Design a protein with these regions (language model features):
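Short, often N-terminal, low-complexity regions
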Residues: 6, 15-18, 31
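Generic alpha-helix initiation/capping and coil-helix boundary signal
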Residues: 7-9, 25, 29, 81, ...
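Short Gly/Ser/Thr- and charged-rich N-terminal loops/segments
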Residues: 35
Length: 332
């Protein structure tokens, strides 16, 4: 069967001529003779096109058209940093990952790019890439897949009910800021800030300013003026968008080219540490579900488990489900 290749940016997908001619009401022979630059190219079926295989996944998704979208380029070790950055900008998702070799024993080497910069760690790229390596590409059949990121080695465990868990690094608790100052600088109404808990910088590999709010309604109406005070801001409140969620959150990171992130595993790891550190639920051990992304029509659910022992050591785990969305060829 004759095929044509439709060209969108630098992404290829094949479309049967018979299907196109039927939809457009054009004779297939006439359609095959079209040569519209930048739109249709008549390429024989089976021709080897140089490029990179890529996959799209939705991470922290409980269903279709949900979660945080991730693009992953396979076999990317021969790409330069500049090429990776251009590809990440072209996809324009919150993050794009590049698998650059490795193995199941020592771990797989992965680089993470936002549309604006490379970052050492991020949550949903970690889970999405581990899912592809084990479930789709079959590079590993182990229950735990290890990723070698710029921030260090991150193990991802494939748990029950199709939930993937990543263990995050020990948290670093930074400066606490006055609530009035935070409200003035970020344009948040002081009445919406929960003054029982601090506004504090926290990092488990990527730093966020954690801002507690008084209610889900306050979280829904908040409008943040992100600036140099906190280029990555994470706001949270008790109460969920769904009945099975105990908390809700929103994340803004203009520094990395992200206006609002649908689901942020790294920030939720910081939240898990914060909740345990400040005994938010009256305990140094937490097990909660967090809703995020509802304000940007990408409903997401993250599973948080964390504890702090008597020596001050934390065990922080963030989980979620992953859905495979699409695959294709990226022409370089």
């Amino acid at each position: 069967m004759n095929h044509m290749v439709r060209y969108f940016g630098r992404c290829l997908c094949t479309i049967a001529l018979s299907e196109i001619s039927r939809d457009l009401g054009v004779d297939p022979v006439t359609l095959a003779e079209l040569r519209t630059p930048g739109c249709f190219f008549d390429i024989p079926w089976g021709v080897d096109m140089a490029g990179k295989e890529y996959y799209l996944t939705d991470v922290f998704a409980e269903g279709p058209y949900a979660g945080n979208r991730l693009a992953t380029i396979i076999d990317a070790s021969d790409l330069s940093s500049a090429e990776m950055q251009r590809i990440a900008l072209a996809f324009n998702f919150a993050e794009t990952t590049f698998i650059c070799g490795g193995n199941s024993e020592e771990g797989f080497n992965v680089r993470i790019f936002t549309p604006a910069a490379e970052i050492p760690f991020a949550g949903h790229p970690t889970l999405g890439t581990a899912y592809l390596l084990r479930q789709v590409l079959k590079y590993s059949d182990a229950q735990v897949v290890k990723l070698n990121l710029a921030a260090g080695k991150i193990p991802v465990t494939f748990g029950r009910d199709h939930v993937l868990w990543m263990q995050q690094h020990q948290p670093v608790f930074g400066e606490q800021l006055e609530h009035e100052f935070v409200g003035e600088q970020l344009g948040v109404d002081i009445k919406d800030l929960n003054t029982r808990y601090p506004c504090q910088y926290v990092s488990t590999g990527l730093r966020f300013l954690m801002i507690p709010l008084v209610s889900l309604e306050a979280l829904k109406r908040v409008s943040v003026d992100v600036n140099d005070l906190a280029p990555s801001v994470f706001l949270f409140a008790e109460g969920g968008y769904d009945d099975d969620q105990q908390m809700s959150a929103r994340m803004f990171a203009a520094e990395f080219g992200i206006i609002e992130d649908p689901a942020t595993g790294s920030a939720n790891g910081c939240l898990a540490a914060y909740l345990a550190e400040h005994r938010y639920f009256g305990s140094s051990e937490i097990d909660v579900r967090v809703g995020q992304g509802y304000e940007v029509q990408r409903p997401s659910q993250l599973y948080l488990r964390a504890s702090k022992d008597r020596e001050g050591k934390f065990d922080i785990n963030v989980g979620g489900r992953v859905n495979l969305v699409a695959r294709g060829q990226w022409l370089l």
